[in-house]
Amino acid sequence: EVHRCIRDPGVESKVAIPIDEIKSPSTEFITGRVTNVDVDEQVVELEDDAIEYDYVLLGIGSGTAFFGIDGLEAHAHELKSLDDARAIHAGIEEAAENASRDDPAQVIVGGAGLSGIQTAGEIAEYRDEHNAPLDVTIVEGLDEVFPGNDPELQGALRRRLEALDVEIITGKFISEADEDAVYLGGGEDDPGEELAYDVLIWTGGITGHEEVHGVGVEQDDRSHRINAEADFQTSDERVFAVGDAALVDQGEDAVAPPTAQAAWQAAEVAGENLARAVEGRPLKTWHHDNKGTVVSVGDDAVAHGVKLPGVGTLPINVFGGPAARTLKK
């Protein structure tokens, strides 16, 4: 939900949850940044401390994947935290102040997955609420928004973005970025199509944090996300991994999706398995139960394949309006 803070940082209190409200009284909470996990010495290394462990669960999330695209990391905002959302808000606010109706500021969102769609929607709503001179464009290298999903859902999301006056460019990859523009396509002697921007946001993929690159457990060679079995155990029996820091095996060459819904489900079993490991009991396996997808696009939302307790899968495959907005909340 951090994307909502792009439009209005004042909603932070509805997005951030104080640790004291969720931890048990017996849980010690330490604030610090993990720099490494030494699996041989069984130590979690922090910037200014070190914590010994018997078992450790790695749930540190993911970073933004820039895929080696020249200039992209240096010039684009990312959206992984409240600080990122604040920075995007400040960027579009400043760009709008320096623009005019005749010469609107250009905002480009790279990537039309979940984060990209929701980001573009929030910026479009900001534009409309503040009557701001902003043009919003979303760029996706594959052929449709929300790649790899049901075409009916893709169509509904496209229509909602278009209703918000978001320009959609698909089938063209960003190949380069500098301080003024992104370049689409191109080659060795072809710089590609130039798109000027005032604010650039990149949401085009995830990767494992640098801090886990050197951890001595099996990882995906490209993304450095940690390989974990369906019980969350890694190649080191004392190291578990969960959430989008991990590639959790789901059988038939599938892994759990890097979504909040999956992480929420997984956390219960992962936590129980830590206790089981300590007690020497067999570990439970977990399989993601997809309860459907709800994507917010500005003030509206689009739902797909929703399953409700006691009801099962709803007979309507894709829907929006008040019902979808209620589910999103």
Question: What do these predicted ranges mean?
Answer:
Residues T27-A105, G110, I201:
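FAD-binding core/adjacent interface of flavoenzyme oxidoreductases
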Residues F29-G32, N36, D128-R225:
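A Rossmann-like FAD-binding core segment of flavoenzymes
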Residues G110-G113, L142:
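Glycine-rich Rossmann-fold phosphate-binding loop(s) that bind the pyrophosphate
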Residues G116:
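N-terminal Rossmann-fold NAD(P) dinucleotide-binding loop
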